[in-house]
Design a protein with these regions (language model features):
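Short hinge/gating elements
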Residues: 39-45
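Membrane-entry segments of alpha-helical transmembrane domains in multi-pass membrane proteins
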Residues: 46-50
């Protein structure tokens, strides 16, 4: 991840830039080709992942602003903090919450997992560590979202989207690795991003629930 970038001179906060950066990104625009519900014939309105994410983001911003307002009324001393940015952080996290979902949603996750556990992908098992293999055989869209946002892909600068740690932590609904996924196969980060998540959690003071010699499990960020 890129930890710092040159200071900007516009009036947007870093959290507002997170939202804007997502809106104009190719991964977010591709959500328009992924259905949120099974498509129906005729004139029935069908949501795709893009419209769903925009709607969720609007609701998240409103709820976040309400929470910030109530906190400031109860704790006026927080006025000089970033508490007023809760709405911006939550709206950006909502915007990104489906970013890692494959086509066909949970069925797509199952198809990817099955390719490695039962299909031709089994040939790769000997090339991977047990933890890497768990990531592939329990493919998870939430973990893939964090990968998209933090990973350096070809042609993109180091740090991926270069988002704030608060926004990144707010999309991690399941703050543990695939080793702890259980039957529901839910987890928050792949092995390739575990060190990044540890860095984020450490900087934000997120409590680690597991022992040092156990697979990583953390508390959730309060804005998840």
């Amino acid at each position: 991840m890129e930890e710092l970038h040159e200071a900007r001179k516009d009036d947007r906060t870093e959290f507002q830039r997170d939202y804007d950066r997502l809106i104009f990104s190719a991964p977010f625009r591709r959500l328009q080709n992924k259905t949120q519900v099974f498509p129906l014939p005729g004139s029935v309105f069908v949501h795709n992942r893009l419209t769903h994410s925009l709607e969720v983001s609007c609701v998240g911003r409103s709820l976040g602003n309400d929470v910030a307002s109530q906190l400031l009324k109860k704790h006026p001393a927080l006025a000089d903090s970033h508490i007023s940015e809760i709405g911006s952080i939550v709206s950006a996290a909502c915007l990104a919450h489906d970013l890692g979902n494959p086509p066909f949603g949970h069925s797509g996750e199952k198809a990817i997992s099955t390719y490695f556990s039962e299909g031709q992908g089994m040939a790769l098992k000997k090339e991977l560590s047990p933890m890497e293999w768990d990531d592939l055989t329990h493919f998870e869209g939430n973990a893939n979202a964090l990968r998209i946002l933090t990973h350096q892909f070809e042609g993109r600068r180091k740090g991926g989207f270069v988002m704030t740690y608060s926004t990144l932590a707010s999309i991690v609904k399941y703050p543990f690795s695939s080793q702890l996924a259980g039957k529901k196969s839910k987890f928050g980060f792949f092995l390739s991003e575990e060190a990044d998540y540890q860095k984020i959690a450490g900087e934000l003071g997120i409590i680690r629930l597991s022992k040092p010699d156990e697979p990583l499990r953390s508390a959730r960020h309060p804005l998840v």
